[in-house]
């Protein structure tokens, strides 16, 4: 069954790439990015967005896209791929019984609300350079929290309905501004509430789906009236990148999810923090230079 699926996806990917007239080098670059981000999505529960946004920003810049639009397109495209990687990785986590579905149900309504406000309002209004700086600063802060490894008070528990609604709104809103699956906020939040890190990562992967769907709708609607976008864009989404990355990442996301359950907690947190630090520095630099 897996072989048939791989064959079908390869056929679809080949046809799609020919239709979009993609250069072999670009296909290879996007495929490599998809393989890496898919693995990270499963491993860290971050949807791969923290890695994808900086690289897509760089690739779009090389293609001569308006500097103010490169970051927005990278963020929107990254979020669109999370629809596929979240499904793939959460299945692997669910088989291990690691997903806290009670938290998913509690956070999802707020996530949808926050995502729509962010992607349809603030995202379209902010300049790309401001988004890049915000991305760098916030991700750097999240990385610092992971390295500090502060122990939450033993008595602290997951908040009630209103608290989860508020937390979900913040996760959805901020995720929409940086194109990530919410793991950079939801994982530290759940750890702060004494949820085990492996459960937090698995639950974050499940939250990636409602985050991605709500934000993608907003990116498409808000981007339809924007001038200067490439012909192969759908709203703010760069369609060729979405097709190639999604087709490749769905195979490596389960591998990352498997690795997440084999690594010790401290090492997992350090991997998470290290990835975020490197990419935060790049995006902060990108925002300052433009």
What are the functions of these language-model segments?
Residues 78-82, 204, 241-242, 246:
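Short hydrophobic/aromatic, small-residue-rich stretches within specific transmembrane helices
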Residues 202-220:
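Hydrophobic alpha-helical transmembrane segments of multi-pass integral membrane proteins
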Residues 184-185, 196-199:
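Short, structured loop/turn "capping" segments at alpha-beta junctions
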Residues 166-189:
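Hydrophobic, aromatic-rich membrane-embedded alpha-helical segments
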Residues 41-50, 175-183:
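Short helix-coil transition sites and intra-membrane helix breaks within transmembrane domains
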Residues 158, 177, 183, 209-213:
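Accessory recognition modules or surfaces
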């Amino acid at each position: 069954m897996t072989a048939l699926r791989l064959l079908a996806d390869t056929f679809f990917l080949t046809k799609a790439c020919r239709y979009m007239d993609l250069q072999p080098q670009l296909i290879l670059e996007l495929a490599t990015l998809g393989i890496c981000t898919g693995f990270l999505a499963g491993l860290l529960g971050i949807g791969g967005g923290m890695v994808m946004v900086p690289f897509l920003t760089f690739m779009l810049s090389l293609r001569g896209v308006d500097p103010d639009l490169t970051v927005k397109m990278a963020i929107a495209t990254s979020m669109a791929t999370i629809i596929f990687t979240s499904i793939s990785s959460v299945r692997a986590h669910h088989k291990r019984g690691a997903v806290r579905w009670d938290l998913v149900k509690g956070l999802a309504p707020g996530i949808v609300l926050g995502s729509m406000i962010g992607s349809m309002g603030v995202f379209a209004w902010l300049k790309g350079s401001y988004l890049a700086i915000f991305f760098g600063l916030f991700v750097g802060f999240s990385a610092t929290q992971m390295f500090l490894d502060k122990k939450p008070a033993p008595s602290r528990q997951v908040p009630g309905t209103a608290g989860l609604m508020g937390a979900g709104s913040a996760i959805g809103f901020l995720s929409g501004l940086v194109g990530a699956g919410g793991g950079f906020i939801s994982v530290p939040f759940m750890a702060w509430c004494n949820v085990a890190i492996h459960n937090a990562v698995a639950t974050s992967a499940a939250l990636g789906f409602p985050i991605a769907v709500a934000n993608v709708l907003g990116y498409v609607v808000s981007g339809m009236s924007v001038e200067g976008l490439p012909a192969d864009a759908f709203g703010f989404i760069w369609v060729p990148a979405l097709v190639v990355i999604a087709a490749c990442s769905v195979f490596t996301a389960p591998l990352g999810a498997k690795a997440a359950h084999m690594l010790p907690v401290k090492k997992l947190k350090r991997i998470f923090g290290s990835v975020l630090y490197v990419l935060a520095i790049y995006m902060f630099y990108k925002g300052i230079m433009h």
